[in-house]
């Protein structure tokens, strides 16, 4: 089964235009619908801030927020039109940003979003939104780097494989993209001293499963010794001219919440090619 609906997170900046263009191209390729979703940054007006701020400040912020939303919609529709995509819709839900984004994400097959810009005024908000969606949406996220041209994605795919639920979910979620790929490499990564050091056998099961779906994949096992797993994956992705990484998104407990794990966070912060992640 292919993708029938895409959602793309839209902002009022050039980085958003690039990911909207990619989302529109993919939606057209898969004959799917595309919905643009704009959520208001957390520092904008809330019931609490509107109660304590002067009326003039509230009015100015509401005006600025409305103008930014209108510009974002205009940019979204222009990018979708340039990609000759007809099945397009727009949403700017009210309420808490993460809750709204998660609810909309669950209505789609896949969500296209962006790597937060470190220097952006809303970088903290964007990071929290991205990590929260990964943990809560129950949908794969295709995360697009903030720099680079990614009008074509999925011709040369690297699967970062572990024998885990998250990895299995990610590979299954990526099937429509993998079926169109020209090259797929499964990369199990182990640590020195593991009983299956090098992971030579750990990729056999998933490659056999992929073969049953008509996808030919090779296995390239790696051992992370003098380099951590995240940097190893990024290095190999560069070596192999990868244009898409597929991997599970991992979490760890911190008090009463779940936060993304170290490898997941490193990839999201340092990625140079789009990454499809599932939790």
Where would I find each of the regions flagged by the language model?
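Amphipathic coiled-coil/heptad-repeat helices and related helical stalk/stem segments
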Residues: 19, 97, 126, 167-170, ...
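Structural beta-alpha unit
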Residues: 1, 41, 78-111, 212-245, ...
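Gly/Ser-rich helix-loop-strand patches that form or flank binding pockets
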Residues: 20, 25-29, 100-150, 236-279
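Small/aliphatic-rich secondary-structure junction motif
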Residues: 1-56, 136, 149, 153-222, ...
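A structural preference for short, hydrophobic beta-strand core positions in alpha/beta folds
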Residues: 36, 89-92, 143, 186, ...
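A short acidic, glycine-rich active-site loop
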Residues: 56-71
């Amino acid at each position: 089964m292919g993708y029938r609906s895409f959602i793309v997170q839209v902002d009022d900046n050039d980085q958003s235009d690039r990911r909207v263009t990619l989302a529109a191209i993919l939606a057209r390729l898969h004959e799917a619908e595309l919905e643009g979703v704009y959520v208001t940054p957390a520092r904008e007006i809330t019931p609490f801030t509107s109660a304590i701020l002067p009326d003039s400040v509230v009015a100015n912020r509401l005006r600025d927020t409305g103008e930014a939303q209108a510009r974002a919609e205009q940019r979204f529709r222009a990018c979708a039109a340039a990609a000759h995509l007809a099945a397009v819709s727009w949403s700017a839900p009210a309420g808490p940003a993460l809750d709204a984004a998660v609810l909309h994400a669950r209505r789609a097959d896949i969500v296209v979003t962006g790597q937060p810009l470190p220097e952006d005024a809303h970088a903290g908000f964007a990071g929290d939104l991205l990590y929260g969606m990964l943990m809560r949406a129950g949908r794969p996220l295709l995360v697009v780097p903030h720099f680079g041209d990614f009008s074509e994605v999925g011709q040369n795919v690297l699967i970062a494989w572990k024998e885990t639920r998250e990895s299995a979910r990610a590979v299954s979620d990526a099937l429509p993209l993998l079926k169109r790929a020209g090259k797929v490499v499964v990369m199990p990564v182990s640590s020195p001293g593991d009983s299956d050091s090098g992971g030579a056998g750990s990729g056999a099961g998933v490659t056999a499963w992929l073969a049953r779906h008509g996808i030919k994949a090779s296995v390239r096992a790696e051992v992370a010794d003098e380099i951590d797993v995240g940097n190893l994956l990024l290095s190999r992705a560069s070596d192999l001219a990868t244009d898409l990484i597929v991997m599970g998104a991992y979490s760890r407990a911190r008090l009463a919440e779940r936060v993304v794990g170290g490898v997941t966070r490193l990839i999201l912060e340092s990625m140079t090619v789009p990454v499809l992640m599932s939790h």
